[in-house]
């Protein structure tokens, strides 16, 4: 599966949107990938995550556990783990930091794939990787369905992406005039407190 195949899954679900969006990172962009519209379809999710699992295996060999950041990473993390034949757990924000909760644990010496939905700056992924390491985990790869940074994001581990895009994203005080003229939509989840 290549980048165009991934984008076709998003288009088919009505999930490739144009306008003026505030991303989870706080950056503004003319393009938003509404992954929840894709993940509501098991067949689309299966195709994407099966392909991501194959890329992970090709890059690092077998893994013992997938760990994902809540909320957005839970579905792709679980489905990717299913194709990798390993368990899936997730970290949640508590006091502003990602932590393992709900009796989840990381087995000593486990080879871990941190699986995310979409990476823009890599901040959520990096925070997830740090939480895994703090819990004693060995993160061998960070993986995502879409890297919209064009390869510039730093998730704190080698990044494997099913699709890599170079989508513009701007700080609020550096918007191009044509983007500033469009009303803002804020579909992100990062500002949810938990």
From Swiss-Prot:
It holds the Pfam family Pribosyltran. InterPro entries: OPRT (IPR023031), Orotate_PRibTrfase_bac (IPR006273), PRibTrfase_dom (IPR000836), PRTase-like (IPR029057). Pathway: Pyrimidine metabolism; UMP biosynthesis via de novo pathway; UMP from orotate: step 1/2. Its cofactor is Mg(2+). One of its GO terms (biological process) is 'de novo' UMP biosynthetic process. It catalyses: orotidine 5'-phosphate + diphosphate = orotate + 5-phospho-alpha-D-ribose 1-diphosphate. Keywords: Glycosyltransferase, Magnesium, Pyrimidine biosynthesis, Transferase. It is an enzyme of class 2 (transferase). Its EC number is 2.4.2.10. Orotate binds at residues 120, 148. 5-phospho-alpha-D-ribose 1-diphosphate binds at residues 116-124. GO terms for molecular function: magnesium ion binding; orotate phosphoribosyltransferase activity. Homodimer. Catalyzes the transfer of a ribosyl phosphate group from 5-phosphoribose 1-diphosphate to orotate, leading to the formation of orotidine monophosphate (OMP). Belongs to the purine/pyrimidine phosphoribosyltransferase family. PyrE subfamily. This is Orotate phosphoribosyltransferase. It comes from Phenylobacterium zucineum (strain HLK1). The gene is pyrE.
